[in-house]
Amino acid sequence: MEARDCDVIGLQEVRCRPADLPEGAFGDRHVSWAPGSLAGRNGVALLTRTAPAEVRSWGTHLVMAPGQAPTPAQALTGNTDGLPTELLPFADEGRYIEVDLADTPLTVACLYLPKGATPDPANEKTIAKQDRKMAFLTGFRDHLVRRRQECTTQGRHFLVMGDFNIAHENADLKNWKANQRNEGFLPEERQWFDTILSPDTLIDVVRAQHPDTNGPYSWWSWRGKAFVNDAGWRIDYHLASPELAS
């Protein structure tokens, strides 16, 4: 973090409970954190150099100054006004938080999209899990449209980054031919990605800058030698409004 010297850092799967976060864990960064209600799971956070002008999340969240330890008294209530119906069951899971930066007209969102399962007709649980993911995708597409349009009206750029649990294109997955029927690379998931990207709405920044590059991958299976062989998936993205992307 010190070497990169980033203005904003997005974290997903911040699985610890607020009480377990060491004091001063993020140094001189301001922390906006939606831990979620599921112990040991999910959680998203944004780290910024300066205090954000506004912080929004669907569920309970914390806003901490540098070196400040989280306490229950700091918990802020989330806002689900206007949230698509499909997203309401996810509101308290620690999957989305966004900040308005105070020193530049930019809204940054951090996302941890639910993981589904490869549907198996003989296993109802896999079908239900994938249906749940697809419901999130339906609602989140509408949410993205709304937030992007609101930011445009306010004269703000918009960026959503995080773990989408989907490889969009063949270049985003090393063994794409063998995974065409697997969750994370299913046709309906990839088609959903097509619907949220366009030159006039949101742009996949990495792919725009590196159109002919495989990857860069951001996740590797712990099985076998996937990491050693760089047999990975690109499931983490920065999607930016056109002016910001350029």
Which positions does each model-derived feature cover?
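Active-site regions of metal-assisted phosphoester/phosphodiester hydrolases
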Residues: 50-246
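Active-site surface patch of divalent metal-dependent phosphodiester/phosphate bond hydrolases
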Residues: 1-80
